[in-house]
A protein has these predicted regions:
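Outer membrane beta-barrel
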Residues: 1-113, 120-127, 131-138, 143, ...
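Surface-exposed beta-loop-beta
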Residues: 114-195
């Protein structure tokens, strides 16, 4: 939804999934491409994008084309990587783009599950991305990026275990007692980097 010129609100709801049969919110964020309420400075509108909210973190590029529940439009293979670096967290990021070069820096709470227990275990997570993305000809687009994600600690970080919708590898590598809802990440490998 475009709230005003250069200000957008994004909200994504899962209608159903392997993990939850009922509707539930994936996340939402406010995106600022212009600052009309601050006099709309040209430098911001030309080079910057700011996102703030509970959102899919901008780590790597695979999350732009991954299958997310029923949305498989950008993924010709339907299933995602076996190690799926995907998570939603509460935070923000700022992206600078100029002539194909991009620099992004972000900060999040480091986890999806908020709470007040064990405050000493909860630290801020920092995310960064450097890259080059340019349409070089009508048939050729070049994109090369590198990302970093770091945290000093969290109660339960979900960088490789953040897919709450479920994998498309139904029951692969599961035993005969498995169920599609209980084992909704079947066929995936989670390295267990939860802290």
């Amino acid at each position: 939804v475009e709230l005003m010129d250069g200000v957008r609100l994004n909200l994504i709801t899962y209608l159903s999934s392997r993990h939850h049969p009922e509707s539930w919110v994936k996340g939402g964020y406010l995106q600022l491409d212009k600052l009309p309420f601050l006099g709309n400075p040209d430098w911001f509108a030309k080079y910057m994008t700011l996102r703030v909210g509970h959102m899919e973190i901008n780590y790597g590029d695979a999350h732009f084309r991954r299958t997310d529940n029923g949305n498989a439009m950008y993924n010709p293979f339907v299933g995602n990587y076996i190690m799926d670096a995907f998570a939603t967290e509460v935070g923000g990021d700022l992206t600078f783009q100029n002539n194909g070069f991009l620099v992004m820096g972000g900060m999040t709470g480091g986890e999806i599950q908020g709470g007040v227990t064990n405050p000493d275990n909860r630290k801020v997570s920092l995310i960064g991305k450097l890259g080059y993305d340019k349409q070089l000809s009508e048939d050729f687009r070049l994109r090369l990026t590198g990302s970093i994600y770091t945290t000093a600690g969290s109660q339960r970080n979900t960088l490789y275990g953040g897919d709450r919708a479920g994998s498309r590898y139904y029951m692969v590598m599961e035993n005969t007692l498995a169920s599609t809802s209980r084992n909704f990440t079947s066929g995936r490998i989670n390295p267990g980097q939860t802290d």
